[in-house]
Every structure is written in C-alpha cells, then in structure tokens.
Amino acid sequence: VYGGLGADARQSIDLRGQVTELDTYQKNIASAKLRVSSAVETMDRIKNVARDVREQLTKLTGNPPPNQTVVQDIARRGYEEIVQLLGTQVEGRYIFAGSDIDNPPFPDSAQFFADVQAEVTAFAANGAAATLAATTAIATDDAYFSTALQAADPSPLRARVDRNLDLSYQVRANGPESPAPPPGELAPFREILRSLAT
C-alpha cells in the first residue's frame, strides 16, 4: 500500500495516525459537550419544575385555606418529575450519577419520600424544629443515592481532548462535592427534593 510512496511512506503513516488521533479527540469533545449541555438543560428543567410548583402553591394560598390533598398532589407530581429528570441518560449513560454512569443515581427516591413524609406526619407531636431537623437529616443522608454517590470522592468523568489534556466533569444527583453549601444549608438538589417531599 505504501510502496509507491518511497521516502514519503513513513510520513504518510504518521499523518494517518495523527488524523485518527484527532478524530478520536473530536469524538470525545462532542460526547462530553453533549453530556454537559444535556446536564445543563436538565438542571434548568429541575429549576423550572421547582419554580412551577412554588407558583402553583402560591396561587392556592388565601382564604379559605387550600385543600391539603391538592397541595400534596402538586408537590408529589413535582417530586416525581424531578426524580425522573435526575435519571436522565445521554448515550445510555446516567448524567447525574457521577462516575457510575451505568446505574441510576437516586434508586431509593420512594424511600426518601416516605421517610420525609413520616417526619411531616409526626409534625403535630414533634414540633417545627424537630421536624425541620429530621427532614434535613434525611436530605443530607447519602444512603438514598447510588453506591458511587455515597463514596467520599468518586472519580470524575474524563474525556481525552488532546494528547496531553483530559477534561474532567461530572454533576452529581446528591449535590456538588465542592464548594460545599454553607453550614445549615442543603445542596440545591437536596433542598428541592426535601421541599417537594414535605
């Protein structure tokens, strides 16, 4: 194949290797870009769901007080939609699962909801401060999330985008590792999940 090239054969082989390498980098960049842009779009949708629920509930306030069943139904639908969004996949990979792209990031979402509801049901007996503390403890518990997200420092996803450059990225359903939220505050996903489950 390269015999007719004579002295240029080596250069032709080298160039083919470089073209293949560049093609691989372009595919890696496109794949990472797709995952990151999908994560951003999904996070926008999560924000919009939370906002929509808040607006619906705000419209219900007034005299007479809203039917509690209607309020719970609105919040439950919002919760279920956000759980579904946290399970978003791109190219067959969960985008909010950290490094464990093959498993859903929030497999125990039903138990999370049930545990928060149990604390809310006990509100009359326990009071506001105890209920807030208990639901915050539930929301900060990583046990509801996938095994990889329970780890202290899961490996970020990496995409080789150049010969000496890897791009690291990840979005975790249980919130960012850094920066940590201020003391007494929950990571945004956790706050939304807790609020909708109450």
Regions found by a protein language model. Give the residues of each.
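Amphipathic alpha-helical polymerization modules
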Residues: 1-105, 198
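Polar, low-complexity export/assembly segments characteristic of proteins
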Residues: 80-83, 89-198
